[in-house]
């Protein structure tokens, strides 16, 4: 697949692709559903294949709750969780419009074995969150709710601390009190020796979970860090897409700048697997593969749109 795309790249044509066999088998798409080349094709490598047994371990037949279910990571978590056949899936989200959108999407998926429950609420509201966890007897929590845009959190640092750090503390304490089996925090590589407020809030959230994991309890706390996720909100991909749609220019601040990337589905599969492997207080760091040059990424996107990069010389 990557070889074919590499051959087509230089040609002045708009490249489109057919659905994968797995997408056809799951009923997500039909054979005649042509689409633009997917983001994963820009990685220049094949996505990591998941361990199916690990994907099922903490989900199949269980009551699962995802915080931040309307976000780019949270919604993909929900998509993958549905196909692992949980007993119930609770979409916990503070933003009404985001919750509405993700619920409408899942209503179209024929999954009679899964009860999907859209719940409005904030992890900062202890009483509300505890009532939900208790009422549904939640067994597994994936905590994806967070403020993650570095400049915005820097400008609104107190809200960043309240949401990312204290929100995690409240959610984790509720999990302990209600004897939730598994609690997985979606963290970031920016928590490593943090140089900004967002990274610091996530690092403190990790330390909170590690401290709680030392208590005598039946709840297993696990943290998973990953870096740049292709096409997530705030990444360069949506920005480049919009710039290409507008006819340019596509802005790259440094032609030699490199970043490590994963697709959203790939990252989420590894999050679910890491959550199943955790023993308590573990921090998993995802192997992001080989670095991708941002200039090359932008060039590929332009070429796959049937356009050419203008030679300024």
Q: What are these model-derived regions, one by one?
A:
Residues 27, 143, 147-206, 211-212:
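Conserved Rossmann-fold NAD(P)-dependent oxidoreductase catalytic core, especially the SDR/UDP-sugar
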């Amino acid at each position: 697949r990557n070889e074919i795309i590499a051959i087509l790249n230089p040609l002045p044509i708009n490249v489109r692709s057919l659905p994968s066999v797995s997408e056809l088998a799951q009923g997500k798409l039909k054979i005649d559903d042509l689409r633009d080349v997917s983001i994963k094709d820009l990685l220049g490598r094949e996505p990591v294949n998941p361990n199916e047994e690990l994907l099922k371990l903490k989900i199949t037949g269980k009551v699962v709750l995802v915080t931040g279910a309307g976000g780019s990571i949270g919604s993909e978590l929900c998509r993958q969780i549905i196909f692992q056949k949980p007993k119930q899936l609770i979409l916990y989200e503070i933003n009404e419009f985001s919750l509405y959108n993700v619920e409408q999407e899942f209503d179209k998926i024929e999954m009679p074995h899964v009860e999907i429950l859209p719940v409005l609420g904030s992890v900062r509201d202890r009483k509300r969150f505890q009532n939900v966890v208790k009422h549904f007897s939640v067994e597994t929590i994936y905590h994806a709710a967070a403020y993650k845009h570095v400049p915005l959190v820097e400008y609104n640092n107190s809200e960043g601390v309240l949401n990312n750090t204290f929100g995690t503390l409240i959610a984790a304490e509720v999990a302990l009190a209600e004897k939730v089996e598994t609690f997985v925090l979606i963290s970031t590589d920016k928590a490593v020796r943090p140089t900004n407020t967002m990274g610091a809030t996530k690092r403190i959230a990790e330390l909170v979970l590690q401290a709680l994991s030392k208590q005598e309890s039946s709840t297993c706390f696990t943290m998973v860090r990953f870096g740049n996720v292709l096409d997530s909100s705030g990444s360069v991909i949506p920005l480049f897409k919009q710039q290409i749609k507008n006819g340019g220019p596509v802005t790259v601040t440094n032609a030699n700048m490199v970043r490590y990337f994963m697709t959203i589905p790939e990252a989420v599969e590894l999050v679910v697997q890491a959550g199943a492997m955790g023993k308590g207080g573990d921090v998993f760091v995802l192997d992001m593969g080989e670095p991708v040059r941002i200039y090359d990424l932008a060039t590929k996107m332009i070429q796959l749109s049937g356009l050419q990069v203008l030679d300024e010389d």
